Structures are given as C-alpha cells and as structure tokens.
C-alpha cells in the first residue's frame, strides 16, 4: 500500500511538473508573438528597405516579416482584415483618399519614411513645353496622384489650376487654363505605365518612382520632368490600424527606418530617386 501511494505521489509530481513546463512554454510562445511584426510592402523600394531593417530590429528582439504586394489596393485590404500588422507603400494624400472611400478603415499614419519624386516620361519630346497641341498624357488611376502631377505641369507653365487650391487635393477638373488642350488620361493601373512608356504610347507617361525602378528605368535621368523633393507632402508612410501606432513593435519599426543606417542605405542605393525623411 505504501509503495502504491509513493508511486502515485511521484506520478502526480511528474504531471504537475509537465503542466508547469507546458505553462512556461505557452507564455514564451505568447511573448514571441508579441515580438513579431508582419509588414505588407511594395517590391521596390519598400521591401528592399525593410530587408535592411531586419537585422537592426533583430537586435531589439523583434522579428520583422515582409509580405510583398504588386498593387495599391490589396495592402490596405489586408491591413483591414488583420492579415498584416502594418503596410509601407502609400503617402498621406493617398491614405486620406482611401479612408474617404472606405470609412470602415480605421487607419493612422505611424510615421513618414521616404519620398519618391514622381517623373514624367516621353520618348517623343524633351520637355513638357514641347508637348504638342491635343497631346495625351497617360497617368495612374488614382485621384490622390493628380494634384502632384498637375503641379509639375503648372510649374512648367503648361497649364494653370484654380487659385487658392490645396494642390494635394487638385484634380483634372481644377484645370482652368490648358492652351495646348492636353488630354489627361487617368485610367491606367500604375504597374502598366512603364510598359506603356516603352511601347511609345501617348505623348507623355507619368510613372511613380517605385514602378520606374522595378522596370529598370532611372527615375532621375530618364524623365523629361521630375517632381521636387523639397517640401514634398507625399512622403511614404508606415500605416497601421488605429491604436497600434503605440505598440512597441511599430514604434521600433519606425525608429529603425528613420535611423542613420537606413537613411544612409536609401541615399546610397537610390541616389536621389528615393529620399529619406527623418520626421
């Protein structure tokens, strides 16, 4: 009888010990999950920049995972559906337009990281002033991009926009003077624009720097006009669901992406086609 009781006591102790180990492991797994962040990003330059940030975040005990996207719609859908923790591909005016169209999206800007000056390309003409009467300008199907594009044309004296207008909110409908009677075709998906340019379609094609880089174009040398990077409101940002901007992983991500190491990488790698920002 004593032997049976002794065996039972040992067995009970073993069960409790295993249970305790199980509890400890579970807590460790939970802690590890809290130290991971999954970020959705465009291939170039966003995912490349994030790859450089991986070891720096690892030093802070954070595992960065990257999921790449090829368009400008799915990254926000994935964020809303909690498939990713953050995304890195869009600028503030674009985010504002997305939130206006999707009031159920509760997103915030967690921090600006870099600027990609947009370029206007042409195989037929050397400047915007050389564009012919009744010419066609092909651009991306994003209303939030129209203001920045039209501002370049206005700066070159090709068109005029309404006075007193917030240029980031300007659209094709705000053109008040267009002496060349240019047609602005804003119906094209952004990823197709480099191919349209290479096919010599239209008189000018507006291409975002990320798509240009992905297609092997030089966003500084190849365009006939380039947007200025100074006082540029189109900084690409880390976007998260509201409330997550205060999470340790998100704060660390923004801090690392704004670090000297990453800023130096951006400057050296993209040579002005992508410009780092620090605030």
Model-identified regions with their sequence ranges:
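Periplasmic-binding protein-like
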Residues: 111-121, 145-154, 213-255, 257-279
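Beta->alpha turn/N-cap motifs
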Residues: 44, 71-72, 82, 87-96, ...
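A conserved helix-loop-strand patch within extracytoplasmic ligand-binding domains
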Residues: 110-159, 263
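Bacterial signal peptide processing site
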Residues: 22-24
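Short helix-initiation/N-cap motifs at beta->coil->alpha
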Residues: 67-77, 166-195
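C-terminal motif of bacterial Sec signal peptides marking the signal peptidase cleavage site
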Residues: 16-20
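Short, well-ordered beta-strand elements
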Residues: 31-44, 62-68, 136-137
